[in-house]
Regions:
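Short acidic capping loops at alpha-helix termini that bridge into adjacent secondary structure
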Residues: 44-47, 91-95, 141-142, 166-169
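Active-site groove signature of glycoside hydrolases
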Residues: 85-111
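Short, acidic/polar
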Residues: 1-5, 70-87, 124-129, 153-158
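Surface-exposed, active-site-proximal loop segments in enzymatic domains
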Residues: 21-25, 57-71, 104-113
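Alpha-helix N-cap and loop-to-helix initiation/capping positions
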Residues: 25-29, 33, 68-76, 112-126, ...
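N-terminal binding-site loop/beta-alpha segment at the start of enzyme catalytic domains
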Residues: 1-53, 78, 91, 130, ...
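Beta/alpha (TIM)-barrel catalytic core signal, keyed to glycine-rich beta->alpha loops juxtaposed to Asp/Glu
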Residues: 101-231
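Conserved, mostly hydrophobic/aromatic
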Residues: 4, 12, 34, 49, ...
């Protein structure tokens, strides 16, 4: 982290579920590492800090409360914000993001049928209101989405405009030479016109674009060798 700052890398992004692959025994570890560095270095003000709340999932180990699903309800947003602040050893987060939607949506390459969209749906205006309370309290400064669709971005923006609620400033989605869904799925048009900034992740396609897996190679220490399901 010292090395990164010395070379001008001052935007740091994490999430409550990290490290990856996520597991109960390692959940929150990335935030704790960053928090320890903040405490030791005293350089919190030098960093633009981003983190994320888990979307709709069965990873209920991220919550102290007894829940069946992780959702973006008021209670879960409150708990997630406070626990991230504790692990990060800071009193504010510069950019707080919804890691993926709190609804049935075609995320992470999933294929959806019409009936699949009906089993879970998120109240966009309520989620924005939950986040607004933390902005007003000074705990978070800006909000964004991640792994979101053009529909989701526009629904959040529509509620912001209609109700005077906080506006999504950014979207963090995959984007690289072989994954162009940001361009092809309508998101690029939405974000250009609505001034929602793209934070592109996976620029090297999980390492495939480096060429290290060419011809079936599997180098020691590579992501695919260590975690086959992430390759």
């Amino acid at each position: 982290m010292d090395y990164a700052l010395e070379r001008g890398v001052n935007f740091w992004d994490t999430a409550e579920m990290y490290s990856v692959p996520s597991a109960p025994e390692t959940q929150g570890s990335t935030e704790r590492i960053i928090g320890s560095w903040f405490k030791q270095s005293g350089r919190r003000e030098d960093v633009i800090l981003a983190t994320k709340i888990t979307g709709l999932s069965r990873m209920t180990y991220v919550r102290d409360a007894d829940v069946s699903w992780t959702r973006h309800t008021k209670d879960q947003v409150d708990e997630a914000v406070h626990k991230s602040l504790q692990r990060l050893q800071t009193d504010y987060i510069d950019l707080y993001q919804l890691h993926w939607p709190d609804r049935a949506a075609p995320t992470f390459g999933s294929k959806m049928r019409a009936k699949d969209y009906t089993y879970a749906y998120e109240p966009f205006e309520e989620i924005l209101a939950h986040l607004q309370s933390h902005i007003e309290a000074g705990r978070i400064r800006h909000i964004g989405v991640s792994n979101e669709t053009a529909f989701g971005v526009m629904r959040f923006l529509a509620e912001s405009n209609a109700r005077g609620l906080p506006r999504m400033a950014s979207i963090q989605n995959a984007y690289n030479l072989v994954n162009r869904t940001f361009e092809d799925g309508g998101l690029e048009e939405v974000c250009v016109h609505e001034k929602v900034s793209l934070l592109a992740y996976s620029p090297l396609g999980q390492g495939y674009l480096t060429g290290k897996y060419r011809n079936g190679a599997l180098p020691d220490g590579s992501r695919k060798k260590l975690f086959e399901r992430l390759g």
